Amino acid sequence: GSGGKINYERYFAPEELDGIYTPVHRPDSVGAAPLEGRNVVVFVMESMSAEHSAHLHPELYADRQVKGYTPFLDSPMQAGYCFERMYANGTRSIQALPAVLGSIPSFKTPFVLMPQALAPTRQLPRILRDKGYATAFFCGSAAGSMGFGAYARSAGIERLYSREDYEARHGRDDFDGYWGIWDEPFLQYAGEEMSALPEPFFAALFTLSSHHPFVVPDAYRDLLPEGLTRNHKCVAYTDNAFRRFFARYAGEE
């Protein structure tokens, strides 16, 4: 329950368990390019699935006119590293950040609603902050939505950017009427703010336009493929939002 009590069971001493199995893998090489001091940006995409991608599932689109709903995102998958069997244990939006940024499994009560979420934890943002990174989190929903604010602070994130921050600069015309700011303008805003962060920085961004009730801006209603489900058009909208984001910011160091 939300009381948050977790029973701690100890079956092995840490050194004994390491001798049996360790999930820590230390590669001999991290690749040709040095990674230390690089900016790190993690995009968490609402309701995205491998089945939306013609690159990941070409067999689904072999006989269809529409070749997937993520034509832009398919491009960096082909040009960069793409891990096809990488999973995070979160099944709902509220569980996404602890799963992706902290490798925290899903409990009966979402982690962000548990008292333990308020205590400092060694998650990716805090690890990088301890190495001198500025840390930020972007989401176009209201600041207190789904406990993200309290969670982000406990995870080591210093600065949160929300719907309120966007509207303070750009007004209220881009509110989708349900969850927050449409992905396209919010991604552009996030890029502006990331450009002003001290380097090196870590930033996480959570999209929202592909969430139920699956609506897109009027200007895009007739420009995007209908798809087989209501979500497909929203996925195509967010994919295009990323296209515009990378077109503007991909060349920045």
Q: Where do the model's predicted regions map?
A:
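Soluble catalytic regions of membrane-associated enzymes that act on cell-envelope
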Residues: 1-253
